[in-house]
Amino acid sequence: MPGLYEKGHFDLAGFSVGVVERNKLLPKQNIEKGDLLIGLPSNGLHSNGYSLVRNIMNQKNINVSLPMSDKSGETIVENLLRPTKIYVKEILELLKNSDGIKAISNITGGGITENLPRIFPNSNIGAKINLSSWKRPSIFNWLQELGNIDDQEILK
């Protein structure tokens, strides 16, 4: 990651692998117009967009120990370093209690606009998303304003 690791530094990462019965594999091919799309709330940046964040912070010379402008009482650094929410408990509970779930999309780098289409069985299927139907974590609003980021880019 340019600008982050110096010679002799390293990154430690991990992953997990799951096992599922073939008949329970997702996405299913029966996704169709009119299906309901449900989103689980993010608690912040998770692990995405930090190259952009670093650029904004460096350009604007931001003191990360200052409080956020959202009156939450949290500092900028507390927002930026908030641990990634892991959704496995919620997802497993949903899958256990409903046989109507046709797909799950992991919204990572690329955001909603690049990840959601991966679950659709063909290009005739799409999604209408009302962006005002949920409260976006304040760190996104703050970064968008500070970095003059357009609406499409902030969705990534």
Enumerate the language-model features and the residues they cover:
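Glycine-/charge-enriched secondary-structure boundary and capping motifs
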Residues: 5-12, 63-65, 69-81, 85-156
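Glycine-rich anion-binding loops of enzyme active sites
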Residues: 1-51
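Glycine-rich beta-alpha junction loops
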Residues: 18-21, 41-47, 54-57, 84, ...
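Acidic, glycine-rich loop-and-beta core segments that form the ion-binding/anion-interacting portion
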Residues: 31-78
